[in-house]
UniProtKB/Swiss-Prot annotation:
It comes from the Viruses. It comes from Influenza A virus (strain A/India/6263/1980 H1N1). One of its GO terms (cellular component) is host cell mitochondrion. The record marks K627 as: Mammalian adaptation. This is Polymerase basic protein 2. Keywords: Cap snatching, Eukaryotic host gene expression shutoff by virus, Eukaryotic host transcription shutoff by virus, Host gene expression shutoff by virus, Host mitochondrion, Host nucleus, Host-virus interaction, Inhibition of host innate immune response by virus, Inhibition of host MAVS by virus, Inhibition of host RLR pathway by virus, Inhibition of host RNA polymerase II by virus, mRNA capping, mRNA processing, Viral immunoevasion, Viral transcription, Virion. The gene is PB2. InterPro entries: Flu_PB2_2nd (IPR049110), Flu_PB2_6th (IPR049114), Flu_PB2_C (IPR049115), Flu_PB2_CAP-bd (IPR048298), Flu_PB2_middle (IPR049111), Flu_PB2_N (IPR049106), INV_PB2 (IPR001591), PB2_helical (IPR049113). It is found in: Virion; Host nucleus; Host mitochondrion.
Amino acid sequence: MERIKELRNLMSQSRTREILTKTTVDHMAIIKKYTSGRQEKNPSLRMKWMMAMKYPITADKRITEMIPERNEQGQTLWSKMNDAGSDRVMISPLAVTWWNRNGPVTSTVHYPKIYKTYFEKVERLKHGTFGPVHFRNQVKIRRRVDINPGHADLSAKEAQDVIMEVVFPNEVGARILTSESQLTITKEKKEELQNCKISPLMVAYMLERELVRKTRFLPVAGGTSSVYIEVLHLTQGTCWEQMYTPGGEVRNDDVDQSLIIAARNIVRRAAVSADPLASLLEMCHSTQIGGTRMVDILRQNPTEEQAVDICKAAMGLRISSSFSFGGFTFKRTSGSSVKREEEVLTGNLQTLKLKVHEGYEEFTMVGKRATAILRKATRRLIQLIVSGRDEQSIVEAIVVAMVFSQEDCMIKAVRGDLNFVNRANQRLNPMHQLLRHFQKDAKVLFQNWGIEPIDNVMGMIGILPDMTPSTEMSMRGVRVSKMGVDEYSNAERVVVSIDRFLRVRDQRGNVLLSPEEVSETQGTEKLTITYSSSMMWEINGPESVLVNTYQWIIRNWETVKIQWSQNPTMLYNKMEFEPFQSLVPKAIRGQYSGFVRTLFQQMRDVLGTFDTTQIIKLLPFAAAPPKQSRMQFSSLTVNVRGSGMRILVRGNSPVFNYNKTTKRLTVLGKDAGTLTEDPDEGTAGVESAVLRGFLILGKEDRRYGPALSINELSNLAKGEKANVLIGQGDVVLVMKRKRDSSILTDSQTATKRIRMAIN
């Protein structure tokens, strides 16, 4: 109070006012503060002060020729004074108004193209639906989210090259556009932006928005795809949320969603094949998502999901250093441990070999619907703070944490035997055995865990074994919190290794991911996923396997035919026949295979019995390991359409129908392709008889002159070679035998050799 009186007193004296308003500021510290650096120290004051002047804006000199000196009201628009320190002129804010009203109008055709992301956003909002506002506690957790809908997925460097090429094509500097997407975008943008008058810098900024994924670490409760994030400020506050349905989808969200589905399908399929890693790579390389190669998407897309990360690891890309267990992402935030093997007994007296983590560690656990903080020591859970969307999600998190803790009371809570297997029928490792067991039923686990009295801590509440909340008691060490646990923000990527069975390890040998961690959730992809690999034929069911197998044989008939006669074993082992085996009843597979292989051998040995249609029809059955038996079959059974259907060994059936006149094959009524050659090889027998006494060496060789007819062959001397015309106009090279004794065998090998030579 005293100070205020004193100040009032001072202000009443005229000298004080004069000192404060008229004296110059010459204190060096103050001058330094306001003049050092380019950064404006008080922008709003500067703006007000500038705009109070008559000519606060500078413009290019040419403006004086384009704007009158005075407007209709007679106000001066520009000053004859030059701007100090540049060759620009000083103009009034009124000049801007005049320009906006009367200045030249340029073409607006480029605006929607340049500001594409903005125009699209307006459309999404126009067609979006905003629902009611609910007031409730929001469990938000910080997640790394995509804040920029509608972008391509180029790296910053790739985008920079594209932007330079589009906006400043004549600038110097090495730009190498390599990826498919870079080239497509550059071509498209150059066409769109012909004669564009918008400032190049603006165009560059807008292109960057379109090409690069921008992520931020934001608190989110609810949808995390970019079309939800762009309206985050409208849909969730501290204590309220507003329902919202986006008015459109964007390709980047669709790519993320479809990539996850493709990766899950591929990992699940690879896990059950003979060589999971090789199969996984083969499938990743032969799959397209929305017309783009999956491997290109994997290289550019930062989505972190278990299956996606396994595919990335297989391709040698870096992935996040966090690990996955029970569908939760674990990130160690402090402490350390060493691994030691230990044998433990379950409640059912089954022995389990556990890799025990010894030492104190703290983790954050982040799942789709629940998050937690876990503190543990060697085989002991010290504290678990969980938050989740609903009771079910909280239960999931508690089970995973209890199993992860490796506590004895958890192992003793096992009732019955643990014999869970993965898709390939291999036993799961002990930790996943325990996890599956308690995910099925956690009652005994929670009952055996033990309870303790709790202190009243703000925002925390106890939870009892039957999942009812309580303020007095709680399961030992477990609390439920209103606040979520943030996702780990560090986006560091580490080098990892992957073994044949798709287990991903960091450089210290800790397992980060394995196929057991891949979600079984099925979804429908937003973009078309095209799996070209035979391993994915069964994804659309047995019929698709049947049709695809026969289509493959027909497409590759030329090479298949040669292998059939020269190297059948290699042909039978082809992976394209693997999916077919699941259609053949297990008990009879071996007998079918033995029968078909024997039949084929007879065809190779006996003249004139080569039958294209029959070979194509029966070939897939020969792929199973054969059992030798005397059994003969007139039809073979395949399991499709929910029952066994028959393929006739001789003749057509609804499953396999070959039309001789059109040469078309239909499998289960679906077109499986056309045979390009005539399956009627009846003439072979005659020719082989005529060629007795000659050895067929192979394809035509021009050095031995023009082709002779079969009749002209008799003039050849022993050991002499010649080209000869046979059958339907094919030419082969033959040599007259030096000895007569081997003549008998010629007719048998001739058929085979003619066939090979022609092919």
